[in-house]
Regions:
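Acidic/glycine-enriched connector segments
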Residues: 1-21, 29-138
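Positively charged, aromatic-accented nucleic-acid-binding surfaces
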Residues: 26
Length: 138
């Protein structure tokens, strides 16, 4: 739709240059080595990448933020607006992050909010680098 396209164009002008790579993972995910390795592999292909994440205070997103600080990678943090959106805040945050149209999404284990972001990204045709455990065959 026209308004969404215009909003996206306006948003793109405000963002730093470089391919946008989104990252998501839960507060209980603490696999530093795997997260740093995944981010290093993506950065090897996209040296000027910009990391998009939810700014979680602990867990996978905190580890990704520490990686970006260490590697000098630009970050854009999409924090949930709890005051404005209440319980829907993390889902609205997911929608805002995807409006940037990242070229890929790195997914580590998390909650239903993590799965929601992965599902929406897949529906938009955004490639997933999925590090969640595979379900056991039934």
């Amino acid at each position: 739709d026209h308004l969404a396209a215009r909003r996206r164009t306006d948003l793109q002008q405000l963002l730093p240059a470089g391919p946008k790579i989104a990252f998501t993972g839960g507060a209980d995910c603490a696999d530093h080595a795997a997260i740093w390795d995944a981010l290093d592999r993506v950065r090897a292909k996209h040296a000027d990448m910009v990391l998009l994440h939810g700014g979680g205070p602990r867990g996978a997103e905190r580890i990704a933020a520490a990686w970006a600080d260490n590697r000098g990678v630009t970050q854009i943090v999409f924090k949930p607006d709890w005051t404005r959106h209440g319980k829907a805040a993390p889902f609205r945050r997911n929608d805002q992050l995807l409006q940037v149209l990242p070229i890929g999404l790195i997914v580590f284990p998390g909650s239903g909010i993590t799965d929601n972001l992965a599902d929406k990204a897949r529906a938009l045709g955004i490639p997933l680098f999925d590090f969640r455990p595979k379900p056991a065959p039934a």
